[in-house]
């Protein structure tokens, strides 16, 4: 059974960040391809089943292509990022990547007829774009998910995920990460992310 999607974002109590109104872009926007690739990868991961380690091998390359994990780490760490040494910054990015892959592999654990429906309308938010999708779950309520994307290296990559179009993954993590950094610095935050990645449930 597909585990709750909110577990991916909820490292601390939820922090809501509503998406503001934005202009609609044309349907053929290249940002759609990124989200469609992610959705296809998530379905492959669920269909693969097996162990979390096996599913990680399926979803890892998809997340590396569709997410800007370096920028997501910087945004999640917030203002404290510039205070970290280059070595600590790299350690944080590596730990964030491991955590993200492990959480997706854990939560998308088996296939039960789920499907994704991507809205063809792409919204612009300054230099970023927002693509909305719906996860349809048999015998359960659909889950609205919005992705914020930014152009990087000639392609559009995801930099934030909004569950139910309101709960920002980055905002939620920034709240948690800030507390850990203040108490124990980069090493403590790396240890926390590694512990989350290693959890069996």
Residue ranges of model-derived segments:
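Positively charged n-region of N-terminal signal peptides that target proteins for export
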Residues: 1-4
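Bacterial N-terminal signal peptides
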Residues: 7-18
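Sec/Tat signal peptide C-region and signal peptidase I cleavage site
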Residues: 19-26
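Early exported N-terminus immediately downstream of N-terminal targeting peptides
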Residues: 27-104
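Solvent-exposed loop/turn segments at secondary-structure junctions
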Residues: 81, 98-99, 123-124, 137, ...
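Surface-exposed, charged secondary-structure patches
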Residues: 101-143, 191-201
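Short beta-strand edge/turn micro-motifs at domain boundaries
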Residues: 142-172
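Low-complexity, intrinsically disordered terminal/linker segments enriched in charged
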Residues: 161-201
């Amino acid at each position: 059974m597909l585990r709750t999607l909110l577990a991916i974002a909820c490292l601390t109590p939820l922090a809501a960040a509503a998406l503001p109104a934005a202009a609609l872009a044309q349907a053929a926007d290249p940002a759609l391809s990124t989200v469609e690739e992610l959705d296809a990868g998530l379905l492959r991961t669920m269909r693969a089943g097996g162990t979390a380690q096996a599913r990680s091998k399926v979803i890892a390359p998809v997340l590396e292509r569709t997410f800007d994990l370096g920028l997501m780490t910087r945004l999640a760490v917030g203002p404290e990022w510039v205070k970290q040494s280059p070595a600590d910054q790299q350690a944080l990015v590596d730990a964030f990547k491991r955590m993200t892959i492990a959480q997706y592999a854990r939560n998308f654990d088996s296939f039960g007829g789920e499907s994704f429906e991507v809205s063809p309308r792409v919204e612009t938010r300054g230099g970023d774009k927002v693509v909305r999708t719906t996860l349809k779950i048999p015998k359960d309520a659909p889950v609205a998910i919005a992705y914020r994307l930014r152009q990087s290296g000639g392609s559009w990559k995801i930099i934030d995920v909004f569950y139910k179009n309101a709960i920002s993954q980055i905002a939620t993590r920034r709240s948690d990460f800030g507390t850990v950094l203040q108490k124990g610095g980069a090493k403590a935050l790396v240890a926390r992310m590694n512990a989350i990645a290693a959890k069996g449930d």
